[in-house]
């Protein structure tokens, strides 16, 4: 009997999801069973964990189970568990508001295109709300472990829900009654639903029972043993796939499956997956890791534990430890030596698998890198990472060969006498290919790696070498393409002579530009462009400085060096005029500097003056 009832409105965000569920065109609607079974299993896992320190919570009912029943006459599917249960506040928070960050990410990804948005349903998994794809009303009855009150939550998904106190006789746990839509009544077919439940339950460690058609006898559908505890030889590829999909709310198949039992000083079992598709929350501010920690088959936590490094947060799966005590507090897991050893072993194993894939399946590895390379490179900024091992699995775009290559491949293709790894960073690889910074290097068939992820500008400041080879930006002032492959005394002498010979030219540019530039030098790397900006070895890289300005970490850009190409016709003309004592090229000098700034993505100091100079030159050309 209902005692008191409150009517409430869903959060606006929940309303958006429910609207999509109710009008869903998603073809694989049966995932609602996956979501509800997974939630029921989680509820049992949570109570099993809490009962380790408070056995009264499971007094008289310590055998966890999930039951599924079809009531065809009333058009209902009933899912029942004896897990942790919910009180009134829990029902409001968990079912009336956005309680799961993954669901919030789902909302952010909605495009307004119904076809695309329906595809997102399968990629995200939206938990309980998926019920409304097949039901026009959902009734949830729940009693929280350790509490006496029973509460009933009910909604048709059309903007409002009710929460009621009830004096109904009800044991601990949660019961969900789905009132199935007429057009979805095929889900009331006993054999079809049994098949669906079985397909989603085989890996669940809680026994799942399905009532027969008469509604009297329970038939256990799953083995109720944790999948990772079984020998690999007894697990099919399909079982691995289904476990992965249930665990990660995914529709893709795993790219790599790692099922290992570690024996020795530290005993643990891991069943880990690398997805084949990019996860939507990879760069979410929460940066949550999706690997669950179990201790002796008891679920402990998947939050706020340092089980895997942040840069491997794309991993999905479970780790089950034999060495940690069951009664360990979550706070004690923060700096636990056993957990640290498990983390190191897993990291080593994952990097080993990636190295193997990179060598054996480069095309597959390129796809993986496009999805997760940005996250993986974050590890190069962390002090505790084995940077060289991580760099071994990194790949980058080659400017010379227009394909992804590793640092080891780059080194193997060094030109004779070359000892430095060159790179250029920017937002767009096509723009980088046309940059004057690398034209000289490429003309000598010296490769340049193109860095286009923001994280690249950070990790190169931490990792200046790889296997004793310097990693150097092509924007540096001291690059001499002639000396890159030869260190002869003769070329050093020629270089000094060149600087002295063009002193008249560099002084004129410096006098004209003043504080807009730090120094003006003769370039040893340009072959066709008139000029480019450059920075000294001690200075911050240009793109890194720009990023810090955007983030308001520093106030203003520093003055850059301007490098001139004496073989360029424009520079040659200015130099010849100077030798003839003609110093009337100030506007052209400013235009050359402005052009160098634009090519480097730097702001022009005076856009009005730049526009006037450009117009003047165009007018002279056509008159």
UniProtKB/Swiss-Prot annotation:
Keywords: ATP-binding, Chaperone, Cytoplasm, Nucleotide-binding, Stress response. NCBIfam families: PRK05218.1. Residues 488-497 have a biased composition (Basic and acidic residues). The gene is htpG. It comes from Rickettsia massiliae (strain Mtu5). One of its GO terms (cellular component) is cytoplasm. Belongs to the heat shock protein 90 family. Residues 477-497 are annotated as: Disordered. Molecular chaperone. Has ATPase activity. The lineage of its organism: Bacteria, Pseudomonadati, Pseudomonadota, Alphaproteobacteria, Rickettsiales. Signal peptide: none annotated. Homodimer. GO terms for molecular function: ATP binding; ATP hydrolysis activity; ATP-dependent protein folding chaperone; unfolded protein binding. Pfam families: HATPase_c_3, HSP90. Residues 1-330 are annotated as: A. This is Chaperone protein HtpG. Residues 547-623 are annotated as: C. InterPro entries: HATPase_C_sf (IPR036890), Heat_shock_protein_90_CS (IPR019805), HSP90_C (IPR037196), Hsp90_fam (IPR001404), Hsp90_N (IPR020575), Ribosomal_Su5_D2-typ_SF (IPR020568). It is found in: Cytoplasm. Residues 331-546 are annotated as: B.
